[in-house]
Amino acid sequence: MIRYFTAGESHGPALSAIVEGMPAGISIAPEDINDELARRQRGYGRGGRMNIETDTAAVLSGIRFGKTIGSPITLQIENRDWKNWTVKMAQFEQPEENIPAITIPRPGHADLTGMIKYGFQDIRPVIERASARETAARVAACSLAKVFLRHAGIQIGSYVSAIGPAGEIAPSPKMQELLSQGAASLSRAADASCVRMLDKENEEAAIAAIDKAKEDGDTLGGIIEVFITGVPLGLGTYVQHDRRLDAALAAALLSIQAVKGVEIGSAFDNARRPGSQVHDEMYVEDGSAPVRKTNRAGGIEGSMSNGQVIHLRAAMKPIATLMSPLHSFDLSSMEAHLSHIERSDTCAVPACSVIAEAVVAPILANALLEKTGGDHLEEILERLNAYKASIAKQFQT
C-alpha cells in the first residue's frame, strides 16, 4: 500500500514528504517530479509568492540509479522565502524584537478554529500549516504514483471548466477528442492556457473576471474536471465502505485546501432525472466487450471502476484572504475588526487542478496494487496483463 506524509510550514526552511510502499523497479527522473511542481506554480491570478519560489525536489532516499528500490522515498523542497522569515519562524531562538501576535481571524479560513483547538494565542502557527503551500509537498509525493500508473497504461488529466462566472460545465467536443488520445493529452492542451481552460472565449472571460476581482480586492473560485483513462474494469470494491473507489477518490479531492464539493460523473444532474435517463446502457456485439454510448456514472459503478473513463469534478471556493477584508473580530479584545490580511492569490483554480491530478494518483495506484499484488514493477505488470486477458476472455462468445 502506498501512503505518504508531508511536513513543513509555509514559511519554514523546507517542505518534506515521505512516500512509503512504492513498488521497486520504477524508473524515475528528476523532471518527473519537478515538472509537476512547475505546473502547480503556474496560473493566472497567483500572488507574489510564486515570484520567489522555484520549486524543485531533492530526493534523499528510496531511489538508486534512477529506479525505486522499495524503501521509503524522502523528498524535500526548499522554501526560498525562508530567508525573509528566519526571525518570525525561528524554531528555537527567542526573537529579540517583539513580534505582534495575529489575533484577527479570516472568515472561511482555519484561523479561528485552529487557534482555539490547539491553544494558540497567535494565528500564525495555524496559517503556516493550513496554507496551501503544503500542496507542493503533496504534488511531489504523488508524482511518483503518477509515473507508476503510466507504466500500467493509466493516465490522469485535468482542465478548468469554470472560474467565477466564466466558463461552462458542459463537455466540449475538443475535450472528447483529447481524451481519445489519453488523459495526459487533455492536460497538455490545458497547460497551454494560463487558466487551464480549453476554450479561448472562456479563457478570455476568466482572465477578465480575475482582473476585476483583483481590482476589487476580491477572490475567485472555480470548477475543476479530472479524467483518468486506461483504468481496467474491477478496481475498488463494494465489500467494505473503506475500500470503495469512489469514496477514496472523493476524500482525496476534498483533502485539497478550499475544495468544498466533489461530483463523480454527472451526479448532481442525475439526481434530477429519472433512472431511464441516467444509467449507462450496455450494448453487446459479437466477440467484443460491452459498449456504452454514455458515461453518466463517471466510470464507477458499485464503487468499482467499470472500464470507462473515470470523470471527477471538484468545486474550489474562493480563497479566504481578501485584500478588501471581511468583517471579523479581534480575539484578544473581543471587539469588531476587519479580518487579517495575508499575502495571497486572487485565484488558484488552475493550480488546484494540477493538485487534483496529483492526489488521486495514489488512490488509483493502491486500487491497482490491491488487485494485482506484487512488490516490483515487472511482477505487477505481468499480473495486470493476465487480469486484462481474463476480462477479455469473459466477453468472448
Swiss-Prot record:
Origin: domain of life: Bacteria
Entry EC number(s): 4.2.3.5
Keywords: Amino-acid biosynthesis, Aromatic amino acid biosynthesis, FAD, Flavoprotein, FMN, Lyase, NADP
Involved pathway(s): Metabolic intermediate biosynthesis; chorismate biosynthesis; chorismate from D-erythrose 4-phosphate and phosphoenolpyruvate: step 7/7
GO cellular component: cytosol
Cofactor: FMNH2
Principal EC category: lyase
Example GO biological process: aromatic amino acid family biosynthetic process
Amino acids binding NADP(+): 40, 46
Residues of the signal peptide: none
Binding site for FMN: 129-131, 257-258, 302, 317-321, 343
Functional description taken from the UniProt entry: This reaction introduces a second double bond into the aromatic ring system.
Subunit structure: Homotetramer.
Family: Belongs to the chorismate synthase family.
Name of the protein: Chorismate synthase
UniProt source species: Prosthecochloris aestuarii (strain DSM 271 / SK 413)
Lineage: Bacteria, Pseudomonadati, Chlorobiota, Chlorobiia, Chlorobiales
